[in-house]
Amino acid sequence: MNFFFKLTKLFYSLIIIFFITFFLSLVLDYFFGKKILELTDNYWKKTEFYGRILRIDHPVYHHGLKENVVLKNSKGFDGLFTFCTDNHGFKNECNQIIDKDFEIGFMGDSFTEGASVKYEDSFVGLYKKASNKDVANLGVVSYSPKIYLSKINYLLSQGYTFKHIVVFIDISDLYDDSFYYSLNTNLEVGENSRRGEKLKLRRILRNNFPFTNFYMFVLKKLNTKSEEQKIKSLTPSFHDEAMKKAIWTYTDPKNINGYYGSIEDNQKSMIQIIEKLYFLLKENNIEMSLAVYPWPQQIENDIVNSKHVEMWSKFCEGRCKHFFNFFPYFFDSKEKYGYLETYKKYYWWDDIHFNKDGNKVIANELVKVLK
């Protein structure tokens, strides 16, 4: 009985010590967390975990990339690669200090950022090398039309200049724009819906307890890494979230489970946002072009004249300098070689993003047209 009492007392003492330690670490993090990360910045740059630190919040257009990053251990689908940003926080070649005047700005999400390849292998980097033009890669993971508009408006207000903006409209833009983001009258991007509430909590953690947020990410990353399977299946396996975001272009229902609002209303909302972007660019004597491209799910399940293609080709009539439609290229490949061979040639396995060959397809067309 005495032994049990002592054991119980020890247990409660350990719990109290744990919570006191945790509380003190949060207090320390609240006041000194940012400074701790700054002091250890050079160490984290040598690890794959720095990918968390280089993606930062923005008070106007929601999120972006940290300036002057040189991350040599960024994890890609075919090994590690070097991820760099310039002095503006745009993905670029390493150690670039450039001014605010650009001939062409490319806007989009992770496809445009080239999140899974080094800059030189992304379609923006390939185009820049071939054309020798002053190019800005404005794209970042998880961007969508509300952020496209907000960020470009912000950059123009900060003295950036462009002659031409090319917007790559992603398949996921309809879902992301309606489900994740809100836009106020000042063109500032906020968060929307239940998912938005989770993002708000995450942002509070990042802003107030940055070091705690970071080491939680490291622990999660290490756990995920230990669970990775190296054996490939004969057919690709996509994340449920990707399947959900892709389905709207090749299904009939006006309302899809898991979506925020009807497909038709979300299409109209996206068009209104891009129309505002068009008028903003026109007021500043900047030409606009749009580009559309398929995800693997579109190649497998959709038609070449997809809803996605139709809505944006119609929008571009009388507005866009160019309308880049990459659906025919990939559907022609499907016709010749089949879906699976087309997928393996142009996309990363078990993922929706273009591999190096897929990026070359996009870049080659840009080089032909944007001279």
Locate predicted features.
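Loop/turn elements at helix/coil->beta-strand transitions in domains of secreted/extracellular proteins
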Residues: N132-D134, Y160-I165, K282-S289, R319-H322
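Conserved SGNH/GDSL esterase-like catalytic core that processes O-acyl groups on lipids
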Residues: E113-R195
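Membrane/wall-proximal cationic-aromatic binding patches
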Residues: K35-A130, A242-P253, F330-K334, G338-W349
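Histidine-centered active-site loop/cap adjacent to the catalytic His
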Residues: F32-G33, K345-K371
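Hydrophobic membrane-insertion alpha-helices, especially the h-region
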Residues: Y12-D29
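Short, amphipathic alpha-helical "lid/cap" segments that border enzyme active or binding sites
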Residues: P145, L149, Q267, I271, ...
